[in-house]
Amino acid sequence: MSIHSASPIIRRKSRKIWVGNVPVGGDAPIAVQSMTNTETCDVAATVAQIRRLEDAGADIVRVSVPDMDAAEAFGKIKQQVNVPLVADIHFDYRIALRVAELGVDCLRINPGNIGREDRVKAVVDAARERNIPIRIGVNAGSLEKDLQKKYGEPTPEALLESAMRHVDHLDKLDFQNFKVSVKASDVFMAVAAYRLLARQIEQPLHLGITEAGGLRSGTVKSAVGLGMLLAEGIGDTIRISLAADPVEEIKVGFDILKSLHLRSRGINFIACPSCSRQNFDVVKTMNELEGRLEDLLVPMDVAVIGCVVNGPGEAKEAHVGLTGGTPNLVYIDGKPSQKLTNDNLVDELERLIRQKAAEKAEADASLIARG
């Protein structure tokens, strides 16, 4: 099944909300988001990072707003970027009220630490007045004290109870413009909690494995946990939490969605791990191609196979395929196109991929124009 094949996954039906100009839930594509790790009060640095995230394809960006100074900085940041911004609020509900005045696109509050119900009501009233959605963000590391006492330790049931407590509160306030997350650093706990929650409510679900780890370990945990849920049709937005450059979170997020045929963006590489049969350096070729072609957004399959054992079969299924041989053979749309030697192999392959991407983009645009 290639990247342009339809996904067999039947997604959970959920209510559609809007985060700025981005639809979330319903029949909307699964949104990929990240979070800045700059000092929010450093407006220039935060804006620069958000723009990098936009360039990487981020649909939504979350920004931590720990105090009133950060709230004022948030307002300045909002004026300088195009992507919808979520304000991450903890402890002081008045910060949420201020960023609502400054044009925030979504408010993320943690029910375990935002305070009394009257404070939650004040935030809801401000959100309702300005049509701002709220994300109820439940986290295993910050459950309410009474739930910690009741369950003794974080459990899927504790996460669900925390979430439903605040869902019920919003229901009583007749506020339905919200999404929910129930995150944990343990994959099985998070997956179980999301499964329970998905059966209870119709609101969109924001998926994440919190504090997943560094680039490698966090990618693996997130791919396993989110992959399980997404394959079951659960999830409307995702965030890959990595102790790394936030841009990597966007890349990994799209790679997970591409692997499940839930969303297509950029090149889907098919490459062999290489062995002594290879007729060119597959690893070096792949590393160079991935770096050079990061800017391409057109959904494409590109196969890079080092020998003739699996090469022709994989290459014929790709938009552009390279099979190792003497000389190497390039396939375009499944048909043999030209032979390449190892001299300037990457340069020529990049040229052919970009040429095919331009043709495909033009054809896709023409198809859309015809309706």
UniProtKB/Swiss-Prot annotation:
Entry keyword Transport: no
GO terms (BP aspect): isopentenyl diphosphate biosynthetic process, methylerythritol 4-phosphate pathway; terpenoid biosynthetic process
Entry-linked Gene3D superfamilies: Dihydropteroate synthase-like, Sulfite Reductase Hemoprotein, domain 1
Listed GO MF terms: 4 iron, 4 sulfur cluster binding; 4-hydroxy-3-methylbut-2-en-1-yl diphosphate synthase activity (ferredoxin); 4-hydroxy-3-methylbut-2-enyl-diphosphate synthase activity (flavodoxin); iron ion binding
Keywords: 4Fe-4S, Iron, Iron-sulfur, Isoprene biosynthesis, Metal-binding, Oxidoreductase
NCBIfam families referenced in this protein's UniProt entry, alphabetically: ispG_gcpE, PRK00366.1
Family of the protein in this entry: Belongs to the IspG family.
UniProt-recorded name of the protein: 4-hydroxy-3-methylbut-2-en-1-yl diphosphate synthase (flavodoxin)
